[in-house]
Design a protein with these regions (language model features):
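Ligand-binding loop in jelly-roll beta-barrel domains
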Residues: 116-143
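Residue-level marker of beta-strand positions
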Residues: 93, 111-113, 133
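Glycine- and acidic-residue-biased ligand/ion/polar-headgroup-sensing regions
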Residues: 68-100, 108-109
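Glycine- and charge-enriched low-complexity intrinsically disordered segments
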Residues: 16-20, 141-146
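Short, surface-exposed beta-strand-loop junctions and turns on beta-sheet-rich folds
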Residues: 102-104, 129-130
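Conserved metal-binding segment of the jelly-roll/cupin
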Residues: 106-120
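C-terminal amphipathic alpha-helical segment
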Residues: 1-76, 80
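Short, well-ordered beta-strand micro-motif
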Residues: 68-70, 113, 136
Length: 146
């Protein structure tokens, strides 16, 4: 348990509620179960000369999913009626162009949100000499919250 070294309103270190923390731990999550269920095992969904699309599966209890795209030129995406949270994790910069003509530039390490209402958009690598690697997170289609 960690309190991120934040200070309370009185300027002193905040006390930890150990019992509350213990109630939020899953002690059955250990050993082989961790390897099988909690550690992400990425796999390639699509690979061709234009791009590689990888799925980075999340735990079944997580409400979000993650894909990783690697490409040199451009890639077209559909929102499928959900927002996308994207981050450029490799490369220089991209230009995002929505189907209605809106354009926005993003640089390496920047995070941006594409609203579901955008419907479709194109991600254009501004420096095709360097590949772009982009991570996209979105809410799973069927979510069951506990």
């Amino acid at each position: 348990m960690y309190d991120w070294i934040r200070m309370g309103l009185d300027g002193k270190p905040r006390p930890l509620n150990i019992q509350h923390g213990m109630n939020n731990l899953y002690f059955e999550r250990k050993g082989e179960k961790v390897i099988q269920e909690l550690i992400c095992h990425p796999y390639i969904m699509k690979e061709n000369q234009e791009c590689t699309i990888e799925h980075l599966p999340t735990h079944k209890e997580h409400f979000y999913d993650v894909y990783r795209y690697t490409f040199k030129d451009r890639i077209q995406m559909n929102t499928e009626n959900t927002c996308h949270v994207c981050m450029i994790v490799e490369g220089d910069s991209v230009c995002i162009e929505t189907e209605d003509g809106m354009k926005q530039r993003f640089n390496y390490a920047e995070t941006f949100v594409i609203p579901a209402a955008a419907r479709s958009y194109t991600i254009i690598n501004e420096n095709p000499d360097k590949r772009i690697m982009l991570v996209k997170a979105f809410v799973k289609k069927e979510v069951t919250l506990k």
